[in-house]
Regions:
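Short helix-capping/linker turns of helical repeat alpha-solenoids
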Residues: 22-23, 36-38, 43, 56-60, ...
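Terminal, low-structured helical/coil segments at or just beyond the last alpha-helical repeat
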Residues: 24, 202-265
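Bacterial N-terminal signal peptides
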Residues: 7-15
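Structural signature of tandem alpha-helical TPR/SEL1-like repeats
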Residues: 41-50, 77-89, 113-122, 144-153, ...
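Canonical positions in the second alpha-helix
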Residues: 53-54, 89-90, 125-126, 155-157, ...
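Hydrophobic face of amphipathic alpha-helices that form TPR/SEL1-like repeat modules
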Residues: 27-36, 49, 65-72, 76, ...
């Protein structure tokens, strides 16, 4: 009797262990281990296989990771339609990373016909969760659809350290478009963006300086305020975590690679 009970327990434990190892979360983590391995332990194709199995079980992060490979044609044949389908599936689950990546495709007309309504639908998933990239893209979209909403969206992303958003937020302040004109604040945000390496922000600084809109004392004060705010922004970037890939600071940010995506959900 005791032997029968012990055998039953062992079978149950074995079944539970197998189920756990085959869960979508576990498959996703095994995929991450495969693509982030060093030297001979790295195996992108094995990682993609794990992502595919997890994605087939409806796990959003795996769907996004697999979509990246389809979108970029990295390691597998590219398929823009499959990439978009996977992004949408994950966005339907409320994943903010998927929201901005799906919305980005419709906003840019990247692999799909440009569709501002669809872009707004998917970007909203991300922007409503204060996702920096979703808010930035939504700001760019709303600049043409309802410009009064753009500054607030830019500010969400600017506070989280996106120099593109800092630049466009400064532009709205400089021009008084959708927000009260404030050239002093514009100078501060142009300075922050320029210090982050967003070169075009230097043009905004030059326009404000050459136009005589600020006194010498105001310029000095704005520069000092920018330096103080940069420390706050740096802490926000650290807290955000989703950073560190080529294309991150392009005018239209590109998708983060799977090894960084785990920090972006």
């Amino acid at each position: 009797m005791r032997r029968t009970i012990l055998s039953s327990i062992l079978v149950l434990l074995s079944t539970m262990a197998f189920a756990q190892s085959s869960s979508p979360e576990s498959l996703y983590e095994r995929g991450m281990d495969a693509i982030t391995g060093i030297g001979p332990t790295r195996n992108d194709m094995q990682g993609i296989d794990y992502f595919r199995r997890s994605a087939d079980l409806g796990f959003g992060p795996a769907q996004i990771a697999l979509a990246y490979y389809y979108e970029t044609g990295t390691a597998i044949a590219g398929s823009q339609s499959q990439a978009l389908d996977l992004y949408r599936k994950a966005a339907q689950q409320g994943d903010p990373l998927a929201g901005w990546l799906a919305g980005r495709r419709y906003f840019l007309g990247n692999g799909v016909q440009r569709d501002p309504d669809a872009a707004q639908k998917w970007l909203k998933v991300a922007a409503d969760q204060n996702n920096a990239y979703g808010a930035y893209y939504m700001g760019r979209l709303m600049a043409d659809r309802d410009y009064t909403k753009a500054p607030k969206l830019y500010k969400i992303a600017a506070d989280q350290g996106l120099p593109q958003a800092q630049y466009f937020y400064a532009k709205t302040l400089q021009d008084g478009r959708g927000i009260a004109q404030d050239r002093f604040a514009a100078y501060v945000w142009f300075s922050i963006a320029a210090d982050a390496g967003y070169a075009v922000a230097g043009t905004g600084l030059g326009e404000l300086e050459s136009g005589g809109y600020l006194t010498t004392d105001q310029v000095s004060e704005a520069k000092a305020k920018a330096r103080d705010m940069e420390q706050v922004v740096i802490r926000a970037v650290t807290a955000r975590g989703c950073s560190g890939w080529d294309g991150e600071f392009d005018e239209f940010p590109t998708p983060p690679p799977p090894k960084l995506q785990r920090y972006c959900h």
